[in-house]
C-alpha cells in the first residue's frame, strides 16, 4: 500500500472501497449488512439504536455492534478542519470552558478539544489524553466518561483528539493500518504532535502524561504507549486490542472476533496474520478493562494486551518481576467484576486487568449522556485516574522527553 500521507496518493472511490470491504468481510468470514458503501454508516447506526448505542442516550450493554474498520487514504492537505469554536461543558461544578482547536503537521491534521480545570496548583499539571471509539466525538466521549469532572477534582488537563470522517468514514482510529502503528508516521505522529503542543502551551508535567481510549481508541492508545514510550507514562485500554494485532482490514475483522486470542509472540502473530508483525517491547504501566460479554471486540483481545505487557516486563525485569493477585467484587451499579493486579516488589500496581462480568462493548461505569456506556459496572474512568496518579514516576532530572 502506498504511503497515505503522500501528496500524490488519491482518495479511494466509494466503489473501490465497497469492493475492498466486501472481499475483506468475506475473507474474515463475516457478512456486511449494507448493500452499498455510502449507506454503511447509516445502516450501522440504525442497527445500534435498539441497543442504546450511537443514536440513543440509553445506557445498556445488552447488545453489541459491528465496528466499521474501513479506512480512507487521505492527503494531509485534503483534511478539512472546521474553524475553531468554543463550547461550555456543563458538569456538576460551575460551567467551565471546553475549547476546540486544530493541529496540523507533515503527517496530517486533526481537530481536538481540551479541558483545563479551574483548580489551581503550585506544581505542573498532569494530562490525560482520551481517544474516542468509532462514531464518537470528543463531546460524546467526554460526557460518557465524565473525565472532565475527574479532571476538575484532581487538577489535571484532558485532551480529546478527534478522528475525522475524511480519514475513516466511521471516525475509527486506524489502528489496523501498518502505517498507523509506527513512530513518526500516520495517526500516532499526529496525536503525539497534539499532545506536545498542548503540553508546551499549558506547562504540563512531561512525566505525567497518560493516554486512554475505548475500542478503536483503546487500540490506538496501546500503539501510542509502544511507539512513544518517553511521552506517555501509562496506558488505559477499555475494550481494545493488542499492539499490531492487524495489518489490514481482513486481519482487523479477524482480530476483533478473537482471531488472535491465546496467541503469543511474534511467531504466533505471523501465523495468524499471514505476515510478519511487530511485538510490544516497552515495559509500560497499563490498566485494561473488558466485558466478558463483548461480542464486538472479543475479551481475548484484552487478555492479549495484558500478556504483551507482562512479556515486556519479564524481558526487562526477569520472570519474577511482578507479583499477581486477584480480587472479586461487585460495583455499586450491580455488576460483578474480577480485578487482577500485577505489582512490583514494593507492592505498586504496574498492570491491572478488570474483567466486567456480563458487560458488553461499553465504557464501564459511564454516563448515559454519552454513547457506548454501561452505568452498572465499576467506574473505569475513576479507576484509570487512580492508577495513573498513583504511579511512582522518575524525577524531572532523569526524565527525557
Question: For each of these PLM feature ranges, what is it?
Answer:
Residues 288-290, 294:
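Short beta-strand/loop motif that positions the catalytic acidic residue
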Residues 162-186:
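Cap/lid segment of the alpha/beta-hydrolase catalytic domain
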Residues 200-201, 206-281, 295:
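Primarily recognizes the serine-hydrolase "nucleophile elbow" in alpha/beta-hydrolase
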Amino acid at each position: 500500500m502506498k504511503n497515505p500521507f503522500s501528496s500524490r496518493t488519491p482518495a479511494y472511490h466509494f466503489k473501490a472501497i465497497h469492493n475492498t470491504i466486501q472481499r475483506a468481510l468475506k475473507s474474515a468470514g463475516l457478512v456486511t449488512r449494507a448493500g452499498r458503501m455510502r449507506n454503511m454508516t447509516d445502516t450501522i447506526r440504525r442497527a445500534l439504536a435498539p441497543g442504546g448505542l450511537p443514536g440513543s442516550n440509553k445506557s445498556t450493554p445488552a447488545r453489541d455492534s459491528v465496528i466499521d474498520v474501513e479506512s480512507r487514504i487521505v492527503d494531509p492537505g485534503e483534511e478539512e478542519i472546521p474553524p475553531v469554536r468554543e463550547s461550555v461543558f456543563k458538569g456538576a461544578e460551575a460551567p467551565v470552558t471546553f475549547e476546540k482547536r486544530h493541529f496540523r503537521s507533515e503527517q496530517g491534521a486533526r481537530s481536538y478539544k481540551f479541558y483545563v480545570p479551574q483548580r489551581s496548583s503550585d506544581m505542573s499539571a498532569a494530562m490525560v489524553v482520551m481517544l474516542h471509539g468509532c462514531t464518537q466525538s470528543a463531546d460524546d466521549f467526554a460526557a460518557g466518561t465524565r473525565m472532565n469532572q475527574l479532571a476538575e477534582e484532581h487538577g489535571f488537563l484532558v485532551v480529546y483528539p478527534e478522528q475525522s470522517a475524511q480519514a475513516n468514514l466511521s471516525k475509527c482510529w486506524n489502528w489496523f493500518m501498518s502505517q498507523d502503528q509506527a513512530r513518526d508516521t500516520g495517526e500516532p505522529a499526529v496525536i503525539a504532535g497534539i499532545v506536545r503542543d498542548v503540553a508546551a502551551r499549558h506547562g504540563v508535567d512531561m512525566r505525567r502524561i497518560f493516554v486512554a481510549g475505548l475500542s478503536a481508541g483503546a487500540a490506538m492508545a496501546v500503539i501510542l504507549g509502544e511507539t512513544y514510550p518517553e511521552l506517555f507514562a501509562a496506558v488505559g485500554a477499555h475494550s481494545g486490542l493488542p499492539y499490531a494485532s492487524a495489518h489490514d482490514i481482513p486481519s482487523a475483522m479477524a482480530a476483533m472476533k478473537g482471531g488472535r486470542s491465546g496467541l503469543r509472540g511474534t511467531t504466533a502473530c505471523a501465523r495468524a496474520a499471514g505476515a510478519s508483525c511487530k511485538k510490544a517491547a516497552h515495559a509500560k504501566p497499563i490498566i485494561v478493562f473488558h466485558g466478558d460479554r463483548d461480542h464486538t471486540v472479543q475479551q481475548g483481545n484484552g487478555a492479549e494486551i495484558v500478556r504483551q505487557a507482562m512479556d515486556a516486563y519479564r524481558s526487562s525485569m526477569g520472570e519474577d518481576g511482578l507479583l499477581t493477585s486477584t480480587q472479586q467484587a461487585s460495583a455499586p451499579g450491580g455488576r460483578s467484576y474480577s480485578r487482577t493486579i500485577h505489582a512490583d516488589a514494593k507492592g505498586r500496581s504496574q498492570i491491572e486487568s478488570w474483567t466486567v462480568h456480563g458487560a458488553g462493548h461499553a465504557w464501564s461505569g459511564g454516563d448515559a449522556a454519552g454513547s457506548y456506556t454501561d452505568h452498572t459496572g465499576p467506574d473505569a474512568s475513576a479507576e484509570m485516574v487512580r492508577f495513573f496518579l498513583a504511579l511512582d514516576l522518575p524525577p524531572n532530572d532523569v526524565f527525557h522527553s
